[in-house]
């Protein structure tokens, strides 16, 4: 398992005494410790990770002379040899290239141990040199330059960053914990352990070590790969079959190797050299040696017993001559280190070959390359006999290969299946060289398992992530030429894989490119790839960006690469640097690769052929088109295009017709609106306002009688039969209203006889039972008017006491038509009673709401609105105030001695004066003239001539009023009546002239609403006034 090479030096062929080439890194002075020390193996990265720290004594850490800890503690210096330092370039600044970076990092359980260097002259010695021999492994990358992930944890550069990480507490500055150094004297507490081991990280989870402190594990290039799920045993265990070597220090500062059997773990490092970490103690380039980050295994303890090894003597077949580490070692064409979900115990590490074996394998590789026989890769059919973890070996084991130059009986040839030191057990079913495990899902390509989803030889599936080189993996021809790696499988009869002719780096890149496209349904796995010193010398380290951005970029680029492979147009060069290298690196190599890939993809587009096909496609035929489907689609699209054009033309025609129809309809609507506007402008709208029971409704009736064919129809009916039908219906309704007026008149007079002061007595007391009958039916609803009602009403109306009470009607509310209907009882009681127009004019119906009447006079349209005159109805007038031509204000002139129904206290004439004033001064009506109808002139003459109710008793101003000179009395009119009616007129004119602004005028008229001729004459006079108002309204006058 590579223990000998780890203990006695790495004497791989082609690495000894090779002079440095031009451009290579110069040889740096190594670290040294004074004193003689037998050549022996230093601790491996596993020891550095797993060795428990002694907690007795702190170790100072210094940076450019600045101490970051307690003073130094003198201790014995050790002179140790390890070729890993020379391989890494001594003290040169080193950061693994993207192709060699690990795709992930893990939380380090501990960083114990140290990584010694070769002794070279010229390097400072002394106590500092002693610390420098142990200290570089103790340093963190960000110990002095920035934040570090955790105590003793290692933060890889972006090339090594993985898409996930384990939580580590951030520590900043120079706050590194004090490292305890045990007493190195013989018998001291740290005699059995490795001095200078740093303490474990607090988050490291591992079981307690069995045995004493210290231990040994081979260096990275000799360790074997591991699985995440418990394959790696970690700690300081040697490979299976070897006992653990405990380095003891005696008084002479010499190592004494003592073999002990104890519970061990397999080393968690695979073919990774120690890393130079910036900020090292005493390093000229501010770098320190750091083992690569690995996971800590969680497998159960395994007892391995074996003979003790003595450090200082090389076993048979191993040459411990110092070699020149500046020349790049020969890397293997092994498979990438994989990390799967389940442990794979078949994998074992094999020791590196000795010089003779390396030479023989190089010769076999040259022969294979000259004969065009490709080297069997990890995914070849012959690779089923090889282990999946051959990345850590110099050459895989070949149990039965006669051409390899090694016999199975030779214990040093690496092919003896029974050699406990070789680590290659041919008979072991778990061994990678066992040919009896062809169906393993992680094997390269077993001939007996062609349907294996992870098999790299699946004919139609892309290469498995674990398969080293699948024959069907999509790769550009230039990729194979650039990488110079043979990825085709070997012949089936090849019993053992041979060493590849190309470098391990190029082969690993090809395998990683093929592994970027997982098989359908296969679970994608994460690989650990071995480093390549060739590229590490060519590609300098790049500054490390923020970790989060690097991971974010990696995940996105990985998804992008999967898309390319799913489409089947990807090249192996796109992923040759690995899953994380595309995002982690930003140097010239990545730029050059991307530039080369772009140049390579351009010739894929044959512009000339595309042009010719598009221009002369009909001549050459569609079969010659590079895109036959697209051409057929164009052909197919021609038919829908013509259909679409016809459909569009049809839709355009329909839309044009629709627009034409809409335009015509719009014109008709506009014409109708214009006509209505003209008719509205030519219509005179008249608003009837006034106090209650002033005669407004009677004026409307008169307009119907005069201009709407009376009550023979509703007006506007062209059919005479319809007019007669409406007339009969309306007259029938008015009969009931007339009977109700008769009943209300007799009831009001009889009830007022006892309420008046002084009360009025009946002239004939025998009519008392008649009074009682009338009072009993006063509040009966839906009275049917029997004949006895008419008899009692007629008898009471002939009584002198009832007549006397009627004369005092001004003291109570009595309808004006009471006397008219009481005088016609004999006519009304008849069953075939048909009211006359005068009866309809006299009928009193309470108006509630707004009633409108349309009529035409001499081809002039009038629209008259009747609004209730009661106080609770006046709030509805506002609806008719907008844009009226004139207001006809109606006043009951005979009501000077009457009170309103609302409170029985306010004089009706005074109420009319107040209402007129409010309308005249209304801000909405200041431009509208008022036609004043002083109505009920017949009743006013009767009261004035009767002399029972004097006007001066209610209006004292009448006593001083004199008839004006411009007064025009009616023919045969009494002067007292003339004086009274002009007094009432002047009362309203006084209001209009007092607040007149010249914008509206008041036109008074004396009217009698029940006199049709009077209303006709008055309305004819008002027509001229209304016409002038109308012209002034539209600014035409």
From Swiss-Prot:
GO CC, one annotated term: cytoplasm
Example of a GO biological process term: platelet aggregation
ADP-ribosylarginine modification, residue list? 844
Q: Which SMART domains match?
A: G_alpha
Residue ranges annotated as coiled coil are 641-667, 730-756
Locate the G-alpha domain: which residues? 682-1037
Query: Can you say what this protein is called?
Result: Guanine nucleotide-binding protein G(s) subunit alpha isoforms XLas
Q: Which species is listed as the source?
A: Homo sapiens (Human)
Its ancestry begins with: Eukaryota, Metazoa, Chordata, Craniata, Vertebrata
Chain's gene name: GNAS
């Amino acid at each position: 398992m590579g223990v000998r090479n780890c203990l006695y030096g790495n004497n791989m062929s082609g690495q000894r005494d090779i002079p440095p080439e031009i451009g290579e890194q110069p040889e740096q002075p190594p670290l040294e410790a004074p004193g003689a020390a037998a050549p022996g193996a230093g601790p491996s990265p596993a020891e550095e990770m797993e060795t428990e720290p002694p907690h007795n004594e702190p170790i100072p850490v210094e940076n450019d002379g600045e101490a970051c800890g307690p003073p130094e503690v003198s201790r014995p210096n050790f002179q140790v040899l390890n070729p890993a330092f020379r391989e890494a370039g001594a003290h040169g600044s080193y950061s693994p290239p993207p192709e060699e970076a690990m795709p992930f990092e893990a939380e380090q359980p501990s960083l114990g141990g140290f990584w010694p260097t070769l002794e070279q002259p010229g390097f400072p010695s002394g106590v500092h040199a002693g610390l420098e021999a142990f200290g570089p492994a103790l340093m963190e990358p960000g110990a002095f330059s920035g934040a570090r992930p955790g105590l003793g944890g290692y933060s890889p550069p972006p090339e090594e960053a993985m898409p996930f990480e384990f939580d580590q507490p951030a520590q900043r500055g120079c706050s590194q914990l004090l490292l305890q150094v045990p007493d190195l004297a013989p018998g001291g507490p740290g005699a059995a352990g490795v001095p200078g081991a740093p303490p474990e990280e607090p988050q490291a989870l591992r079981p307690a070590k069995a045995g004493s402190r210290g231990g040994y594990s081979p260096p990275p290039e000799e360790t074997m790969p591991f699985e995440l799920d418990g394959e790696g045993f970690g700690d300081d265990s040697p490979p299976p079959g070897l006992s653990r070597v405990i380095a003891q220090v005696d008084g002479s500062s010499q190592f004494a190797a003592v073999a002990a059997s104890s519970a061990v773990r397999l080393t968690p490092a695979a073919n990774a050299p120690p890393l130079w970490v910036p900020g090292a103690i005493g390093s000229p380039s501010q770098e320190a040696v750091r083992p690569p980050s690995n996971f800590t295994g969680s497998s159960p303890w395994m007892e391995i017993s074996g003979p003790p090894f003595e450090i200082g003597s090389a076993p048979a077949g191993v040459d411990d001559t110092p070699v020149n580490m500046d020349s790049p070692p020969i890397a293997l064409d092994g498979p990438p280190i994989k990390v799967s979900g389940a442990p794979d115990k078949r994998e074992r590490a094999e020791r590196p070959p000795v010089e003779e074996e390396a030479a023989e394998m190089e010769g076999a590789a040259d022969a294979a390359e000259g004969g065009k026989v490709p080297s069997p890769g990890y995914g070849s059919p012959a690779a089923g006999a090889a282990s999946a973890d051959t990345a850590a070996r110099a050459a895989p084991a070949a149990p039965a290969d006669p051409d390899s130059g090694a016999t199975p009986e030779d214990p040093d040839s690496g092919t003896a299946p029974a050699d406990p030191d070789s680590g290659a057990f041919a008979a072991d079913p778990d061994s990678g060289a066992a040919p009896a495990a062809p169906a393993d899902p992680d094997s390269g390509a077993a001939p007996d398992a062609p349907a294996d989803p992870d098999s790299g030889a699946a004919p139609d599936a892309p290469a498995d992530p674990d398969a080293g080189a699948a024959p069907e993996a999509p790769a550009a021809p230039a990729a194979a030429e650039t990488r110079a790696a043979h990825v085709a499988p070997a012949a089936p009869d090849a019993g053992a894989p041979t060493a590849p002719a190309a470098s391990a780096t190029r082969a690993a890149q090809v395998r990683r490119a093929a592994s970027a496209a997982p098989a359908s349904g296969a679970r994608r796995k994460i690989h650990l790839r071995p480093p390549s010193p060739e590229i590490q010398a060519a590609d300098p380290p790049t500054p490390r960006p923020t970790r989060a951005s690097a991971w974010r970029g990696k995940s996105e680029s990985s998804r992008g690469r999967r898309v390319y492979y799913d489409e089947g147009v990807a090249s192996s060069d796109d992923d040759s640097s690995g899953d994380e290298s595309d995002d982690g690196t930003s140097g010239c190599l990545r730029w050059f690769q991307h530039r080369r890939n772009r140049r390579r993809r351009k010739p894929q587009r044959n512009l000339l052929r595309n042009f010719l096909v598009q221009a002369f496609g009909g001549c050459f035929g569609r079969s010659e088109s590079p895109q036959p489907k697209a051409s057929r689609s164009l052909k197919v699209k021609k038919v829908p295009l013509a259909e679409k054009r016809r459909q569009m033309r049809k839709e355009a025609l329909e839309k044009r017709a629709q627009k034409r129809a809409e335009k015509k309809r719009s014109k008709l609507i506009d014409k109708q609106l214009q006509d209505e506007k003209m008719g509205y402008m030519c219509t005179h709208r008249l608003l009837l306002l006034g106090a209650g029971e002033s005669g407004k409704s009677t004026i409307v009736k008169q307009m119907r009688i005069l201009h709407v064919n009376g009550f023979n129809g509703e007006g506007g009916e062209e059919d005479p039969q319809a007019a007669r039908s409406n007339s009969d219906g309306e007259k029938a309704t008015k009969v009931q209203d007339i009977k109700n007026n008769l009943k209300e008149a007799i009831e009001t007079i009889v009830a007022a006889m006892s309420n008046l002061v002084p009360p009025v007595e009946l002239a004939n007391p025998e009519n008392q039972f008649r009074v009682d009958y009338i009072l009993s039916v006063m509040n009966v609803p839906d009275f049917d008017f029997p004949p006895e009602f008419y008899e009692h009403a007629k008898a009471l109306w002939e009584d002198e006491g009832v007549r006397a009470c009627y004369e005092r009607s001004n003291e109570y509310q009595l309808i004006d038509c009471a006397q008219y209907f009481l005088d016609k009882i004999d006519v009304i009681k008849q069953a075939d009673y048909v009211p006359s127009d005068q009866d309809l004019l006299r009928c009193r119906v309470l108006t509630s709401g707004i009633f409108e009447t349309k009529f035409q006079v001499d081809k002039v349209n009038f629209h008259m609105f009747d609004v209730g005159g009661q106080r609770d109805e006046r709030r509805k007038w506002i609806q008719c105030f907008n844009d009226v031509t004139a207001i006809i204000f109606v006043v009951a002139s005979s009501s000077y001695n009457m009170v309103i129904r609302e409170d029985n206290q306010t004089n009706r004439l005074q109420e009319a004066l107040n209402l007129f004033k409010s309308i005249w001064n209304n801000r909405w009506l200041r431009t509208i003239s008022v036609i004043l109808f002083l109505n009920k002139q017949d009743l006013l003459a009767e009261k004035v001539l009767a002399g029972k109710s004097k006007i001066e008793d209610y209006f004292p101003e009448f006593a001083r009023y004199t008839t004006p000179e411009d007064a025009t009395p009616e023919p045969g009119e009494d002067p007292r009546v003339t004086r009274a009616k002009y007094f009432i007129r002047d009362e309203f004119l006084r209001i209009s002239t007092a607040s007149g602004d010249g914008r509206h005028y008041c036109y008074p008229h004396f009217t009698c609403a029940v006199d049709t001729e009077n209303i006709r004459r008055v309305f004819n006079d008002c027509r001229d006034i209304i016409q002038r108002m109308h012209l002034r309204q539209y600014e035409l006058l």
